[in-house]
Every structure is written in structure tokens, then in C-alpha cells.
Regions:
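Helix-turn-helix DNA-binding elements, focusing on the entry/boundary residues of the two helices
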Residues: 38, 49, 60, 75-78
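The alpha-helix within a helix-turn-helix
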Residues: 42, 53, 82
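DNA major-groove recognition helix of helix-turn-helix/homeodomain DNA-binding modules
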Residues: 57, 76-91
Length: 107
């Protein structure tokens, strides 16, 4: 999706029209939301990318790409990330929308 397509879609949304979401846009948004949630939780724990990579059985460049929203991890990797980040990973996925959060485990 290029900028002019996004602008047209946004203008139509603001006008109250129903707008279909391109699957690429939805996937990119989910990847970005997931990356941001991982980054936020990692910083909250005071971990470096290398430390998180070690805990989750990844490499530091893989963590960097994921936090940047450049890749969507597999389900087994999501499980390892939740464990490495000491919490429960919550994914809420709906048509055209997603929400990703970590809920820390009780101490």
C-alpha cells in the first residue's frame, strides 16, 4: 500500500464509509504491534536484544527484525518469547484490527 492509497482510505474512513482492509496492511500492522509489545516488555525488564535472544533461543538480529516489525514469528517462537519475557502473550486479532500485550506473571 502506498501513501496515496492510505490517504484515500483514511479520508473515506473519516467520512464514515466502510473501508475494506488490504491483507498486507493488516499483516504489517500485526507485525508492528507485536514488535512494539516485545520491545516494550524487553525494556521494562531491562534486557538487551542479545539477552532476550539468548533467553528465547534466537539471535540478536532476529530480535531486532521482529521488534522492527519486519517479520512475524511462528507459534513456537511466540511461546518461547512469552517465557523469556516472563509473561503471558495476549493476541487479539479481528478483521482489520489487532492488539498485542504481555501480562507479567505474578511474582
Amino acid at each position: 500500500m502506498n501513501h496515496s492509497m492510505w490517504r484515500t482510505r483514511r479520508t473515506r474512513q473519516l467520512a464514515g464509509e466502510t473501508v475494506e482492509y488490504d491483507q498486507e496492511y493488516v499483516d504489517a500492522r500485526l507485525a508492528g504491534d507485536l514488535g512494539q509489545a516485545v520491545y516494550d516488555r524487553r525494556i521494562e525488564l531491562g534486557l538487551s536484544q542479545a539477552e532476550l535472544a539468548d533467553r528465547a533461543g534466537m539471535t540478536q538480529p532476529q530480535v531486532s527484525r521482529m521488534e522492527g516489525g519486519d517479520t512475524v514469528p511462528t507459534l513456537p517462537l511466540l511461546r518461547r518469547l512469552a517465557k523469556a519475557l516472563g509473561g503471558t502473550l495476549n493476541l487479539a486479532i479481528d478483521e482489520g484490527d489487532s492488539r498485542v500485550t504481555f501480562t507479567p506473571h505474578a511474582a
